[in-house]
Amino acid sequence: YVKDTANGFMTIADCDAAIGQELNIATGVEHSIGDLANELIAQINPNAKIVCEAERLRPEKSEVNRLLGDSTKLRELTGWAPQYTFEQGLAATIEFLRGNLDQYKVGQYIL
């Protein structure tokens, strides 16, 4: 979630021991695109169904199948930890977008 990420960057900036270190800002919890889609459906419209359109599918082998970040080193250096769950971050993002729809081209699929 963006607030956790921003807080992580600020925490790193305030930590002299972090200078020159490679650090990950991450939850340490893996979520698939399916998890994301299902949680969005649960929060926005529980009656929605996922429909795949073949022309929008990416070619096989064009994607990384799994990503999982480990922020152990950051936590040990600074005490940083994420403050938002996956579900809380999505809920806050949905609330923000609902309040700012006029800023987006809703209903247009742009590549």
Over which residues does each language-model region extend?
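C-terminal substrate-binding subdomain of Rossmann-fold SDR/epimerase-dehydratase oxidoreductases
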Residues: 1-111
